[in-house]
């Protein structure tokens, strides 16, 4: 059985030391992406995450999940999929500060947006974390609906962008 006191101390140390460093890094990346033009922010963050992502503990989890979902992939195909995942995730992060402008710039089109027109009693829109998942609510906003989001807060409570 794991040492409960050790786990509590480790969790406390992470909150005191690691979380503030992580929050600072995230806010710095957000600030950099915000001042860069949208295409540059997307490309730079995509390249950065493609480089750094495979060195994180999350890469192992992604590989295990990929093995469960697609066991037929060989090692080269797995590397290709995982590299694409990190690049896409970085691009999403790079685009995040610009999301509110992306629709207005004509870069985004919503397939099936007309299905939202005329709804009078509200609706649930459920989206997966595929592509830039932050854009989903703009489909409803674009046809004049109010939007409320239900989500799980970040584990890193120091960040509320």
Which stretches of residues belong to each language-model region?
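Short internal beta-strands
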Residues: 149-153
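Histidine-anchored nucleotide/phosphate-binding helix
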Residues: 132-142
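Conserved small/polar residues in nucleotide/adenosyl-binding loops
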Residues: 159-161
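Alpha-helix C-cap/termination motif
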Residues: 35, 142-143
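Membrane-anchoring hydrophobic helices of lipid-metabolizing enzymes
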Residues: 2-127, 132
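Residues at the starts of beta-strands that form the adenosine-phosphate
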Residues: 146
């Amino acid at each position: 059985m794991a040492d409960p006191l050790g786990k509590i101390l480790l969790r406390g140390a992470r909150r005191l030391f690691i979380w503030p460093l992580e929050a600072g890094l995230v806010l710095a990346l957000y600030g950099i992406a915000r001042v860069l033009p949208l295409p540059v922010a997307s490309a730079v963050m995509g390249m950065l995450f493609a480089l750094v992502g495979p060195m994180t503990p999350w890469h192992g989890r992604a590989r295990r999940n990929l093995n469960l979902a697609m066991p037929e992939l060989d090692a080269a195909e797995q590397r290709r999929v995982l590299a694409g995942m990190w690049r896409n995730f970085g691009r999403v992060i790079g685009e995040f500060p610009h999301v509110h402008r992306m629709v207005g710039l004509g870069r985004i089109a919503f397939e099936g947006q007309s299905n939202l027109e005329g709804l009078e009693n509200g609706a649930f829109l459920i989206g997966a974390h595929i592509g830039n998942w932050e854009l989903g609510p703009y489909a409803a906003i674009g046809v004049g609906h109010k939007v409320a989001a239900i989500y799980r807060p970040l584990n890193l409570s120091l960040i509320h962008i």
